[in-house]
Amino acid sequence: MVAKNIKYNEEARKKIQKGVKTLAEAVKVTLGPKGRHVVIDKSFGSPQVTKDGVTVAKEVELADKHENMGAQMVKEVASKTADKAGDGTTTATVLAEAIYTEGLRNVTAGANPMDLKRGIDKAVKVVVDQIKKISKPVQHHKEIAQVATISANNDAEIGNLIAEAMEKVGKNGSITVEEAKGFETVLDVVEGMNFNRGYLSSYFATNPETQECVLEDALVLIYDKKISGIKDFLPILQQVAESGRPLLIIAEDIEGEALATLVVNRIRGGFRVCAVKAPGFGDRRKAMLEDIAILTGGQLISEELGMKLENANLAMLGKAKKVIVSKEDTTIVEGMGEKEALEARCESIKKQIEDSSSDYDKEKLQERLAKLSGGVAVIRVGAATEIEMKEKKDRVDDAQHATIAAVEEGILPGGGTALIRCIPTLEAFLPMLTNEDEQIGARIVLKALSAPLKQIAANAGKEGAIIFQQVMSRSANEGYDALRDAYTDMLEAGILDPAKVTRSALESAASVAGLLLTTEALIAEIPEEKPAAAPAMPGAGMDY
């Protein structure tokens, strides 16, 4: 077993403090509209330029193992906030440092760390309740655009794109961010259900220019096994041909005689048909086929359910107003499924998302929900250079998550103003705490609430304490607009923060800072001293 180095009490706390401070200093310079960039060296490719707190935090790794523990704990604050709300990572880091630094001063002066932590937790609950009270639901397209603009570092183009995407795909829709090939940042919206499986033969294409197969008022056959022989397949094909409607076939695979028959039918000008492979793999494939069946009002023909392809009839087929199949993907527009069945399916998927502990499963379930309920929007981020593109993509990601958070829990006056407005409520709560150290813990949170505003002001080249006093003396929604160096009504000016982001930042910061304050010992491996390299071999005495 490797020997360990143990630090106790004061020495341990100093090491943690140094680690916390080192990480926080690197992260907090990015806060606010006048926050600076951080350049991160990469082992391959160009350096990364970013203003995203969690990206900076993830790159910090300190040489001293004990200091690194403090840094890693604060890194956890940023990561947890990003996981919960998708934004607010820098605010969370600033709050964590403020709570820990002030708490450490009191622990050193003799306060009981456990009572301090209890006081911190009680104060955070009071502030979170107040945040929920003062938050305002998002009602307009304009407010969504404002939230996204602020989170994208005051980039109105990004803000408007995200608001447009949200409007088109709805609350449950999926917005994905990709890198574009050109300079322009554009929005593509895929309405209806889309999955990445294209036609099995180019002969199915109905438009030679776009190489797409477009089927209007189509029937949809959904089968969970391979189709290779024509014998079992022929009865349903004859029924469809008699109906005069085009047919989309979705199956695990279509090959051999079955595929050849369909292709020959198309070449000879028979009824319009297109065959695609089923999306997904394993159990996920089955679930997606069931989704398509519910969306189109058809049935999944499955031998597990006692159904056979040879017994299939028109009543089992789904229906869609339009189907567009390209070489790479398939889109089903306006499936004719029952609205109640579709809503029940969406609720079932939402429940699975809540119950799932795997991030990957949650992401895949969210994709299914989006495809069923709203559609998919893709924001393609373009820029002149790769470095600029990556920096811009970070901002688009932040803005997207902030917007989703705003729709979920409402909005607050931004720029750190909302936390300042919670100070009077917390001051009124203090006398209710009878334990002196708990009261000190609550006062630590009280003082920390002004830290984000002071940091935004400092990054704008102003004195944070003076700005704080000015904001405290003003009315509810008035705050400091660092971009214009003016005091204004933050809601009217469109300087907004999602309530979920502010709440998550405070909760994560207080949780980790409280744990650090109650830490009395640090255990780390003693780094092994590597032996000096062997001296170079002397020359063999031969001249060339």
UniProtKB/Swiss-Prot annotation:
It is an enzyme of class 5 (isomerase). GO terms for biological process: protein refolding. GO terms for cellular component: cytoplasm. Induction: By stress. It comes from the Bacteria. ATP binds at residues 30-33, 51, 87-91, 415, 481-483, 497. Forms a cylinder of 14 subunits composed of two heptameric rings stacked back-to-back. Interacts with the co-chaperonin GroES. Together with its co-chaperonin GroES, plays an essential role in assisting protein folding. The GroEL-GroES system forms a nano-cage that allows encapsulation of the non-native substrate proteins and provides a physical environment optimized to promote and accelerate protein folding. Belongs to the chaperonin (HSP60) family. This is Chaperonin GroEL. It comes from Chlamydia trachomatis serovar A (strain ATCC VR-571B / DSM 19440 / HAR-13).
